Amino acid sequence: MMEKNENINVEILTTSDMHSHFLNGDYGSNIYRAGTYVNQIRAQNHRVILLDSGGSLAGSLAAYYYVIVAPYKRHPMIKLMNRMHYDASGVSPSEFKFGLSFLTRSIALARFPWLSANIEYNVTKEPYFSTPYCIKHFGDLKIAIVGVTADGLMENEYSEMEQDVSIEKTLVASKRWIRYIHEVEEPDFLIVIYHGGLNKISNSTKNKKASSNEAEKLMEELGVIDLMITAHQHQTIVGQDHETYYVQAGQDAKELVHLSINFKKRTTTYDVESIDSKVIDLNEYEEDQELLDLTFYDRKAVAYWSQEIISDKGLMLSVNGLQDLVCQTHPFSQLLHDAIQLAFDNDITCVHVPMNGEKGLSGQIRNEDLYHAYPYPDKPMDMTISGQNIKDILEYSYSHLDFVNEQLSLTIIDETLCTMWQGFNYEIDMNQEPGQRVMLDQIDLTKSYRVTMTDYCYRNYKNYLKNAIIHESYDETMSTLIAEKLRDPNYRISCSDNFVVKNR
């Protein structure tokens, strides 16, 4: 027990959005260097809290491998974070990309809690990840850590989970749980891990999704947060808003934020005397050999798989900008149509641009190349929708494009929402007003059609597809089906010129 007026220092170390970057060397992961720094701090002071704000399980080639290729193996990021003795992690929406079974299995092997107060069981409304907060004791000093996830980021993330999981408004859940923590636990210091961003950053970027960057609102309306750890915007920042400190620790373990908090003992409580913060450039530290040894075979397996050749036919499927895909059937989009038909034998197929800045494929194609062309785990769905649904989806994307002198000049849409259809002919007249540009041939707007599209399309256009009938979801991902097509020695790409865009 400390005497009155004595001081105590607590070191808080935080990482963010590490995206399973555990491959070292040319891949540049700094988690092994972070291990060295954390060990140095622990050697100087045993009062250390190591936190991650979420986003550690998905978002890289290595993450894809451990979900799609080797799902039976323990996730290397969990092994690393266990060995580094993380105290808690927030929960990112990206953690749900590969489904609940993967996420639940990964978290079950973690020796630290995953915290999110507003991700709940759909039926009972209890927190999905057990208790959404934890308490760290240093003598009679009590530090509470609670996690919340930006509800705006959770929208459209994974359709499979909706029958099991619901998302409460971040602000509502935060108020309820923080009030509970203060009344029941009476902590000396409260940390909120918020997997969402700062509005002041989002105002200068294209990412302005509602309810995604509410850190300032939480700090202002709750008023009892001592430290807020934010995430998702992939920037490194340290600041103060009224009485609350806030930090964000970049991405991919490139940097680490270190806060040294000095507490002074009062009669029955502790006061914060000072908070010193610094951003740690991890490139200045050597990699921790124990951590490297821990993932040696994991890294070797991913490296071997990534270089496996899928096709050496010398296919030319390069994409030189969005215009290549939205103005005519491109060999790359034809490959997507051919692949998705392996799942369900429907005449009508809908595919979308796999990623912003899509480059396509060319030459010798390895697993790594295919991942970079189609990095997301989209899965085909068999459904019945109306002709009007088809028109509405096409109208949406072409209403957000503009052409000048036959060149695409303006894109005010996430490129992955641009869809390409086959199974009927259609024409886009960019000279018409938005919402009146699409003409469908052989499609009756009042009739229903059996269609194959990805779960990504379904989630993001669900407001148009409220009356859709879902028949079946396919187990394998689009990239797996694409690889199957590319490996077929008899496969030849033959483009179906079924749509035209008038942009003069």
Spans of features found by a protein language model:
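Acidic/histidine-rich, surface-exposed loop or edge segments in extracytoplasmic proteins
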Residues: T14-H21, K313-L322, Y464
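Short aromatic-centered micro-motifs
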Residues: K136, D288, V438
